[in-house]
From Swiss-Prot:
One of its GO terms (molecular function) is proton-transporting ATP synthase activity, rotational mechanism. Coiled coil: none annotated. GO terms for biological process: proton motive force-driven plasma membrane ATP synthesis; sodium ion transport. The gene is ntpD. Involved in ATP-driven sodium extrusion. Belongs to the V-ATPase D subunit family. This is V-type sodium ATPase subunit D. Keywords: Ion transport, Sodium, Sodium transport, Transport.
Length: 210
């Protein structure tokens, strides 16, 4: 469907410039879409690897915890879980991936505190409980990393969809409209030129007959 414009040379020049810009924009957006897809696939793989590793470590820590509960007094476990484990600091900054602002989470334990994550007596403890607590402690930064990657995947997917719509709009609407309109104006101008030539010939012939 062509645009509703006057078939003039000025309009033809303007539309040709628009077509050049639209074609260049389409290529840039298509390149961006391809690169976004490439990075998105890498992130999905990373997300799956992280999730599998976390699930495996969680199962191991839970297994140790269940074993520990069977050999340690329940009151001690309840008291232990009620204790504040450790102070941590989490900062979130933004980084730019192909014009997409994604979160970058930084996790850090408070080094001013005791190096032992949980302060509890070893009288009622056992190896399974120690491993379980250590395992859950090490999971926190990995869980934050997983959250970071999953949020990045979500934002990248939204940008890919947005870019895809823009690429399709240019490819299937804007560029074809411009090309059809340019063709129409060219045909109209050629038609006008032929009509003008025919008119001049007739005028010349009329002058000759006189």
């Amino acid at each position: 469907m062509r645009l509703n414009v006057n078939p003039t040379r000025m309009e033809l020049t303007r539309l040709k410039k628009q077509l050049t810009t639209a074609t260049r924009g389409h290529k840039l957006l298509k390149d961006k879409q391809d690169e976004l897809m490439r990075q998105f696939i890498l992130l999905i793989r990373k997300n799956n690897e992280l999730r599998q590793a976390i699930e495996k470590e969680t199962q191991t820590a839970m297994k140790d915890f269940v074993l520990a509960k069977s050999t340690v007094e329940e009151a001690f476990i309840d008291e232990l879980l009620a204790l504040p484990a450790e102070n941590v600091s989490i900062s979130v900054v933004e980084k730019n991936i192909m014009s997409v602002k994604v979160p970058l989470m930084n996790f850090q334990y408070d080094e001013t505190l005791n190096e032992t994550p949980l302060e509890y007596g070893y009288l009622h403890s056992n190896a399974e409980l120690d491993r379980s607590i250590d395992g859950f402690t090490q999971l926190l930064p990995k869980l934050l990393k997983l959250a970071e990657v999953e949020k990045t995947c979500q934002l990248m997917a939204e940008e890919i969809e947005k870019t895809r719509r823009r690429v399709n709009a240019l490819e299937y609407m804007t560029i074809p409209q411009l090309e059809e309109t340019i063709y129409y104006i060219k045909m109209k101008l050629e038609e006008n030129e032929r009509a003008e030539v025919t008119r001049l010939i007739k005028v010349k012939n009329m002058g000759t007959e006189e």
